[in-house]
Amino acid sequence: MNPARCRILAVGKVRRGWIQDGIDLYLKRLPGLTISELRDSNPDKEADAIRAALRPDETLIALMEQGDTLASVPFAQRLEQFGNQRLAFVIGGADGLTAELKAQAQWRLSLSPMTFPHELARLMLVEQLFRAQAIVQGSPYHRA
C-alpha cells in the first residue's frame, strides 16, 4: 500500500481536538496521505462537491455502514490488490452518502456495523491505513 497514492475526501470539519491530534499522529506516519475537507451541506450538494473533487484516475472507495466489513489483515490484502491505482476514500457527512454516490463507488467499505461520528471514522480510517501499511511491511505495529 502506497499512502502517496491514497487520499481521504471527508465532508465536514473535525471539531474535537483529541480526534485531530490522533489524525495528525497517523498522517505524520503516512507521508503523502492527504485529507481534503469538503463543506457540509445537504447530501445532494455534498455529493456534487465529492464528484467535483474526485480525480478521473481515482478509484472511489465509499465508507458506509452497509459496506464490506473486513478485519485488518484482509483489509491490507485488499488494498494491495489495487496495486498502483490512486485511491480516494470518501467519508460523507452526518446524513451519509447519496445512493448515486454509493452506486458509483468501486468499493463500499464499512469500518464497523456500528455507526460513528464522521470525524471519528476519519481517525479510525487513518489508523487502519497505517496498520495496513505495517502489515504489508511486516512491522511489529500489528500484533494479531
From Swiss-Prot:
Binding site residues for S-adenosyl-L-methionine: 63, 92, 111-116
Keyword vocabulary terms for this entry: Cytoplasm, Methyltransferase, rRNA processing, S-adenosyl-L-methionine, Transferase
Main subcellular location: cytoplasm
Entry's EC annotation: 2.1.1.177
Reactions accelerated catalytically: pseudouridine(1915) in 23S rRNA + S-adenosyl-L-methionine = N(3)-methylpseudouridine(1915) in 23S rRNA + S-adenosyl-L-homocysteine + H(+)
Top-level taxon: Bacteria
InterPro entries: Alpha/beta_knot_MTases (IPR029028), RlmH-like (IPR003742), tRNA_m1G_MTases_N (IPR029026)
One of the record's GO molecular function terms: rRNA (pseudouridine-N3-)-methyltransferase activity
Subcellular location: Cytoplasm
Pfam families membership: SPOUT_MTase
EC category: transferase
GO CC terms in record: cytoplasm
Subunit relationships: Homodimer.
Function: Specifically methylates the pseudouridine at position 1915 (m3Psi1915) in 23S rRNA.
Entry similarity comment: Belongs to the RNA methyltransferase RlmH family.
HAMAP family for this protein: 23SrRNA_methyltr_H
Protein name: Ribosomal RNA large subunit methyltransferase H
Native species: Synechococcus sp. (strain CC9605)
